Amino acid sequence: MNIKSIKQYILAGTLCCGTAAVTTSCNDFLDILPMNDVVLENFWTEKADVNSVVNSCYEALQNSDVQTRMGVWGELRSDNMVMGSNVPNEINEILKENLLESNPMCDWSKFYTVINRCNTVCHYAPKVEAIDPNYTPDELRATIAEVSTLRALCYFYLIRTFRDVPYTTAPSIDDSQNYILPATPFDAVLDSLIENLELVKDDAVRRYYTDDSPSAYQNSSRVTRWFTYTLLADLYLWKGDYDNAIKYCDRVLDFKRQQYKEMLDREGKLDNIELYDGIPLIMERKNGSTTCGNFYNEMFGTGNGFESIFEIYYRANQGAANSWVNSYYGNSNNVLGRLAAPDFLFENVAEGKNQLFKAKDCRAYEAIQASNSSNAIVKYTRTGSVSFTTQNVRNIASLNLQSQRRSDSDANWVIYRLSDVILIKAEAEIARGGDDFTDAFLLINRLNKRALGITQAAMSADTLKIDDYANSRDKMESLLIDERQREFLFEGKRWFDLVRWARRDGSTRRLTGYASLKYQEGVNVIKIKMSDPNYIYFPYAKKELKVNPLLKQNPAFNKGEDSELTK
């Protein structure tokens, strides 16, 4: 990529006000010089300037192009999504596995906008700390940890999508700099992200506000230490370093236990959060209630709930909008969005005949709704008013499901939540094998019990049977794969899961088996395409190849070259 080609984003927009957290004015910078004569050094004089640019990193992350690609790259090619209503051609082509370098979804420039803003903060913030006594060394370290985590998140999306990508931690601020860079291999980028986060992980803020503060939402809409730890756990999982993945998961789990205890001490009794074998989780049914939907309402309806670790923050009338959910999942005017769920995910679920979901699994009804001959995606599209009962479920009507759809494009987009930590740890334990199978099963079982509406009164009941799984690695892996699909349906993770397992397997066989389930036509052609291990990644955009002669196209899209899966 020619990073100089995205320099316009930092010069034209780096120091615009962010809407995710603080609202420091950016006028100081914008009024200094005409935009084509901007001198960045003239801006960096005080703590408020640093905060402005940090906020702009979050603002760039809210961008609709970034949000849409998080969904498209992480979900669209998986077995979770098919055509909905009025699907754009570029999306339809990806659904048909007709990937072309001219497809707009191959454009990664907005991710590099976020990266470049983060790099700029890392470059200039130390200079501000040296001249502004109000900007302390501890605050500087917290700032570097914050933007380093956001930068790592963006690079993580890029390598999971394209495999090898241009990588730099230097900002694009000087016309004399040469920013035509070749692609850095996946493993080298991954190692660098881990190394960088290891240096700053303990500098990140633990909490910005107490849990009972009106501003507590910032504890999960800004980078915290727990987000950095969770991202590190995920990075280590992809690296195959399972001990470290488990270590960082345990740190987050310990914090959540501490947070739960603090809430108990403060409030005396909680009717919506319960310990599931020692891990606090939001219940589907509050204690004493007969209706489900409580977990959805807190996690996806209202947002920034107890289990949230990091989510991209949107609020109505604040400039940024989650157009991915509004357009592709649905809205108050259109139940069916541009995308839909395949039949096998929802057919006969309430009758107890679905291959993935049990009849009482709340996650099915919170994510999918029958709409004429299609299955509408409703996760994120409903407000915090979902209510239904699964006690005597016989069919969809027997659920007596009540909900209200969003009128604004203000659904937060969840990047990590407590379920991620639980299932990252479970996957790492399965990969380690041996005695870890039992603990991995118990981790998965906790989420399954919650999803089936188990409350305190029946906490000892198991919804899964350990003897059915824990004596076989293959069965444990299949259980984990299915539970991740049930838990994270439409959250932008399924395709990345399939890619991770393909890299671990050294084969696309398992990926192809799952991803082809949604197709009814052309299945053999699609399987042949996916048998090429390079094809599981996206091609580089045609415009990037034109401006960067050092960038070489993925061999799956340059026919005739040897194919080899990088593990």
Predicted regions, residues:
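TPR-repeat structural position
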Residues: 242, 435-437
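Short, surface-exposed recognition loops and adjoining beta-strand edges that mediate ligand/DNA contacts
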Residues: 41, 68-85, 168, 206-226, ...
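A short, exposed helix-loop element centered on a Lys and neighboring polar residues
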Residues: 27-71
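Elongated scaffold/linker segments in the mid-to-C-terminal portions of large proteins
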Residues: 45-49, 54, 58, 65, ...
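Bacterial Sec-dependent N-terminal signal peptides
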Residues: 19-46, 193, 233, 426, ...
